[in-house]
A protein has these predicted regions:
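Short beta-strand/turn micro-motifs composed of small residues
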Residues: 38-39, 98, 155
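Active-site segments that bind and position negatively charged phosphate/pyrophosphate groups
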Residues: 201-359, 366-373
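Residues that form or flank phosphate/diphosphate-binding pockets in enzymes
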Residues: 46, 104, 163
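A glycine/threonine-rich phosphate-anchoring loop and its flanking beta-alpha core
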Residues: 111-210
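Solvent-exposed alpha-helices and their adjacent loops that cap or buttress functional pockets
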Residues: 4-6, 29-30, 86-89, 110, ...
Length: 377
C-alpha cells in the first residue's frame, strides 16, 4: 500500500542479497540512460564498488564515479555546489550510495539538474531515504529544500547489517520519534488545526510499535529486526510522499529540537556533532516528558482568561526572538518562523477551550499512542 501511494518512488528492493538487483532496477526505471555513482570513501568500499561491478556486468553504461574524499562529511551547501558542478557536465542518472548525507546531497543536486535519481542504502540510520526534500545546512541554518524523492531504492539488509552500531541506533531513534510525532498530530487533529489523514497515518503508525519492539535484535544485527527497522524508516518517507503538504506524518516537535541543535552547532563531549537520529532522540525524550505533564493536567481547572491575557503579542515575541538570537548565525530566522506560525489570542483561547471540553477524548488517544520517558530510555 505504501508504495502505491508514493508519488515519486516507483521501485523498492528491500531484503537480504538485493544488491544484485541494482542493474535490473536501474534498467527498468531509467532505460537507455547512463549512471553515475555518488559515494564517499566509506560507502564506496561498503557498496559502491560492488554497485559499479554489477552495473558493468549488466551492461549499464556509467560515468566516472564521484567520490567525496572528506574524512567526515555533513549535509552542507559546499557539497551541493561541488556535486552540482559534476552533474552539470553529464546527463547521467545519479545513484547515491550511502545514507543521510550522500542521499540528501544527491537528491537536491539531481533536482537542480531536473532529473531523477536512485539510492542504494548502506545503513538503517534515518527516515529520509524516500522523503521529498533534503535537509541541508546553508548560511548556518538547517533547512529543508523541496526536491523529489528517489525514483528507485535498493536496500540490502546484508549491507545494512554491516553498518556501525551507532548508525543503526540512530535509525532506531529516528523511528522512535514517530511516537511523539503521532501524538503531536493527534493534538492538532483534536484542535482542528490539521486533521489526521488516515492514509499517511496508517503508513507510519500501523506497524510502528512492532518495528520498535526488539531493539536488542537490531543492535545485534539480526536480519529480521533490521529489515523491520529499515522498512519502518522507508514508510516514513512514503507517508510524506502521500501527504505533500508537510512532514507532519513522520516528524513533530522532536525534529524541531534536532534542527535547533544543528543551528546551534551542538557537539557532544567528544567534540562530534550527534547524528540526526540521536538529535531527534533528545527531542523525543523532551516531547515525552512534556506529554507526561500534559496528561497530568486538569484542563477544566485552567484560568483561560488569565492565560490568554498573559500571551505575548506577535511583536513582543519577535522582539524577544531577535534579542535571543542576536549573536547567532541566524539572528532573524526564528522571528520569521514565529510570524509564520503565530497563534492569535483568539486562536489560543479556542485551543484551550477545545482542550478543556474534549480533554477525556484527547488524553485517551494520547495514552494509546505514547510511551513513557522511562520506557523510552
Amino acid at each position: 500500500m505504501a508504495l502505491d501511494n508514493a508519488t515519486t518512488t516507483k521501485a523498492l528492493q528491500l531484503g537480504c542479497g538485493v544488491i544484485s538487483t541494482v542493474g535490473d532496477v536501474f534498467a527498468q526505471q531509467f532505460a537507455g540512460r547512463k549512471a553515475i555513482i555518488v559515494a564517499d570513501k566509506t560507502t564506496w568500499h561498503v557498496a559502491g564498488a560492488k554497485v559499479a561491478e554489477i552495473l558493468a556486468r549488466d551492461g549499464i553504461a556509467t560515468c566516472e564515479p564521484y567520490i567525496f574524499d572528506e574524512p567526515e562529511m555533513h549535509a552542507e551547501w559546499k557539497y551541493i555546489d561541488r556535486l552540482d558542478a559534476v552533474l552539470a557536465q553529464t546527463d547521467a542518472v545519479a545513484i547515491a550510495v550511502g545514507s543521510g548525507t550522500i542521499n540528501d546531497t544527491t537528491k537536491l543536486c539531481s533536482a537542480h539538474q531536473q532529473r531523477p535519481y536512485m539510492v542504494v542504502a548502506t545503513a538503517a540510520s534515518m527516515d529520509g531515504y524516500v522523503a521529498s526534500g533534503a535537509s541541508i545546512t546553508k548560511d548556518g541554518k538547517k533547512q529543508t529544500f523541496a526536491c523529489p524523492a528517489p525514483q528507485a531504492v535498493v536496500a540490502d539488509v546484508d549491507i545494512i547489517a554491516g553498518a556501525p552500531e551507532a548508525m543503526t541506533a540512530s535509525g532506531y531513534g529516528d523511528l522512535f520519534a514517530k511516537v511523539p510525532a503521532g501524538a503531536d498530530w493527534i493534538v492538532a487533529d483534536v484542535l482542528g488545526v490539521e486533521p489526521i489523514d488516515p492514509t499517511p497515518w496508517d503508513i507510519v503508525q500501523g506497524g510502528l510499535h512492532d518495528a520498535l519492539s526488539d531493539p536488542a535484535a537490531c543492535r545485534k544485527g539480526d536480519p529480521k529486526a533490521l529489515q523491520a527497522l529499515a522498512e519502518g524508516l522507508m514508510l516514513g518517507g512514503f507517508a510524506m510522499q502521500a501527504y505533500p503538504r508537510s512532514s507532519r506524518p513522520a516528524s513533530g516537535a522532536e525534529h524541531q529540537i534536532s534542527h535547533m541543535l544543528n543551528m546551534d552547532h551542538f557537539v557532544m563531549a567528544n567534540g562530534q556533532a550527534p547524528s540526526h537520529g540521536f538529535q531527534v532522540s533528545i527531542g523525543t525524550i523532551v516531547s515525552l516528558f512534556f506529554y507526561e505533564q500534559l496528561l497530568q493536567t486538569d484542563f477544566s481547572a485552567l484560568d483561560i482568561d488569565a492565560l490568554v491575557n498573559r500571551w505575548p503579542s506577535l511583536e513582543e515575541q519577535k522582539k524577544a526572538s531577535l534579542e535571543m538570537f542576536r549573536d547567532s548565525d541566524f539572528p532573524t530566522f526564528a522571528a520569521g518562523e514565529i510570524e509564520a506560525k503565530y497563534s492569535s489570542p483568539e486562536e489560543l483561547r479556542r485551543h484551550f477551550e477545545v482542550m478543556r471540553d474534549r480533554q477525556d477524548e484527547l488524553k485517551c488517544r494520547l495514552r494509546k499512542q505514547l510511551l513513557t520517558v522511562d520506557q523510552a530510555i
